[in-house]
Amino acid sequence: MSEDHFDDELDGQGGGGSRHPMAARFRGYLPVVVDVETGGFNSATDALLEIAATTIAMDEKGFVYPDHTYFFRVEPFEGANVEPAALEFTGIKLDHPLRMAVSEETALTDIFRGVRKALKANGCKRAILVGHNSSFDLGFLNAAVARLDMKRNPFHPFSSFDTATLAGLAYGQTVLAKACQAADIDFDGREAHSARYDTEKTAELFCGIVNRWKQMGGWEDFDD
């Protein structure tokens, strides 16, 4: 299915009158920052262990900012692979008594409910995933949606905003920690590889780049 199909779908859903500034900024798409921590690199076989999502909002001057963060530790799905090296890298302890993990279905149902609420508040029709190396996060999100046979996924199935690419353009850095440093965003390496922390820092980075572009005159509030 082509990008043009989704563009036509969004245009067809638009009503009369002026659009919400956020909907006008991203052509009806709402940026939602997502980060996942996993049991490996294969979205079809490896466990989803943590997921966080931060919705993005816009102030009255047209500048964007991180709004609300949803975070869940997730139980590996039945038969999921978990690589020991992945646990060592992330520091996740599956048997920790305070981990309090939930099922994939519980996590995604709650996140999707919050995203749909944000879509309505911003006059948008579909969410677009923002991630640092976003294809990885979108791949695991889509794999979980397919496993659960979820019919109401608010995210675009293949388009995304990649902050590794955007940060490379804006700051000459593609590593999240270094990109944040270049953007004067505090980054604690001891907190890295937590889905919540990485999502919130990625959201700050994304908003900073979008706002910087606006300040430089790269985007004006118009509706074509």
Curated annotation (Swiss-Prot):
Cofactors: Mg(2+)
Molecular function GO labels: 3'-5' exonuclease activity; magnesium ion binding; nucleic acid binding; RNA exonuclease activity, producing 5'-phosphomonoesters
Residues that, per the record, bind Mg(2+) 1: 35
Residues the UniProt record annotates as site (Important for substrate binding and specificity): 41, 89, 136, 158
Record carries keyword Disulfide bond: no
Annotated catalytic residues: 193 (proton donor/acceptor)
Gene Ontology biological process terms from the UniProt entry: DNA replication proofreading; tRNA processing
Superkingdom to which the source organism belongs: Bacteria
Cofactor note: Binds two Mg(2+) per subunit. The active form of the enzyme binds two Mg(2+) ions in its active site. The first Mg(2+) forms only one salt bridge with the protein.
Cellular component, GO annotation: cytosol
One Pfam short name: RNase_T
NCBIfam families, per database record: RNaseT
Similarity remark: Belongs to the RNase T family.
Listed PANTHER family: DNA POLYMERASE III SUBUNIT EPSILON (PTHR30231), RIBONUCLEASE T (PTHR30231:SF2)
Subunit structure: Homodimer.
Name of this protein: Ribonuclease T
Annotated source species: Pseudomonas fluorescens (strain Pf0-1)
